[in-house]
Amino acid sequence: MTLSINPNIYGIPNCDMTQKALGWFKEKKIAVKFHDYKIEGITKQKLSDWSKKKSWEVLLNKRSTTWRSLSAAEQEKITNQAAAINLMMEQNSIIKRPVIEYGDQLIVGFNEEEYKKTFK
């Protein structure tokens, strides 16, 4: 399938949900650009932009191993967007994956139904 612009997929290659998303796009023959947090990092500006489209609570993966490995005191400090962004910059594996940018749209997490609606 040819789209006017290619989606950007942000994630970590060994993440199950990122792999699932990449597989979905490959199956649909949709070309994507993959951004590996571990190699390319993430900017504060990008996280701030994303937080305007989806709340920081959506972007911060509280079910992740990284979140669960934080002490209760560290977790309790994350009460606002600035604190969440700083944490996501320090430990980018705590960002919910994948994050997909497509034009002005932002999809967070693997959601096949949303993919079907967006990429038709």
Kindly give the residue locations of the regions a language model identified:
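Local sequence-structure signature of Cys/Sec-based thiol-disulfide redox active-site neighborhoods
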Residues: 2-28, 32-37
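Short, flexible turn/loop "capping" segments at secondary-structure junctions
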Residues: 1-2, 92
